[in-house]
Amino acid sequence: HGPLLTASQSNAPIIPLYIVEPEYWKQPFASRRHWHFIHDCLCDLDSALAEMGQNLIVKVGDACEVIKELHLKHHVSDVYAHEETGNLWTYKRDIAVEKLCLNDGIALHTSPTNGVVRRLRSRDDWSKIRNARMAEKILPKPNMLPSFPSCRSDILPAKNGPIFCDIPIGAVQKGGRKQAVADLRSFLNYQSREYLYHISAPGLSEFHCSRLSAHLAWGTLSVREVAQSIIKRRSQLSPDEKKSFGRNLTAFGTRLAWRCHFIQTIEAQPDSLLLH
């Protein structure tokens, strides 16, 4: 996690912050299925952060109001975050947060998290930039985080909390970093064997797809991490395994690049996509 690692190197107290925004969960694109997955992720993240010395701080409220309150109480000097390509609602929220930081003298530092290039000047440069990002070294986690005992967390809303949408029908995919690593390993070693043959079949695709989309969307895996894991797995294949896994892993790697490319198009041409 680039922003967290960079923040930890400042040796200043850190607030690892997640904001539950009630207005977000009122939007038509929001789903309690998302929250079930995110809840798993946050519980996992809290445990991992606690091992470094500082628990996750959860706040419920409007993002700007939460940041403003934290700034008034704790004199926040910097905010470190990943770039994201969301929808119109999240875009407007991001702009509001940027204005708040600018007006209140808070330095906002954002880092890319995938192959999407913010303010790309030429499409001809995209593939080269994306490939260079995928080849960068996986960042280590911080050894420790200075504790911030004066900053108190709100209670993490329950999966069945009233601010979320309708109760989901059927099973919901389990989230969290540990589950993400297990799902990636399982796909590389087992499901990917017949990925190409069954990915378009409504019935069989359930058993041969990667199950990584939600992990990539909510950050329990990075695109770079998955791309490098594919390369590593291919290098370990025996001659017999290359016949069954090789082509399938290559195809999945291509689709992983498509994911970045499609999001890049949304980033670069949001108005055009809304019209069509």
Give residue spans per PLM region.
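Active-site "lid/cap" and pocket-lining segments within catalytic core domains
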Residues: 1-253, 263-264
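Aromatic-anchored, charged helix-turn/loop surface patch used as a conserved interaction hotspot
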Residues: 254, 259-276
